[in-house]
């Protein structure tokens, strides 16, 4: 199944767009890092908010339809994402920010914001391994 919600991968250095896929790990033009680009019109046409409100899962998988994966599969059993936000009024006042919130990714398995990307990489690798064995 194709990732219908993804249009390509844009290089953060040269700005060129390449097809998004497992074989494209860095920019083929300059070796830069690639950012996934989404088809927001497609997402808007098929994504509905009410099922999201009904889901009790606080992890990143709550937003499955918005992620660049093919669908539910062998997701890691670790709780990734859904980490709390804390209001930081004193720091916000000092910095001149009216409403400042701080995300506590220390609640993730390795206490890092990188856990979301790592979980996504594991899923994508599993999808490719599954295709290789079909």
List the predicted regions and their residue ranges:
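PLP-dependent amino-acid enzyme catalytic core
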Residues: 1-131
């Amino acid at each position: 199944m194709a990732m219908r919600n993804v249009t390509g991968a844009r290089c953060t250095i040269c700005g060129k767009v390449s097809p998004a896929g497992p074989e494209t790990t860095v920019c083929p033009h300059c070796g830069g890092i690639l950012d996934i680009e989404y088809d927001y019109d497609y997402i808007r046409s098929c994504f509905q908010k009410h099922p999201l409100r009904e889901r009790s899962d606080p992890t990143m998988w709550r937003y499955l339809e918005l992620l660049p994966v093919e669908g539910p599969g062998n997701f890691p059993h670790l709780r990734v994402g859904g980490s709390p936000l804390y209001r930081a009024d004193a720091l916000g006042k000092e910095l001149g920010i009216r409403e400042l919130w701080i995300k506590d990714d220390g609640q993730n398995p390795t206490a890092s914001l990188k856990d979301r990307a790592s979980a996504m990489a594991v899923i994508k690798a599993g999808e490719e391994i599954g295709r290789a064995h079909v």
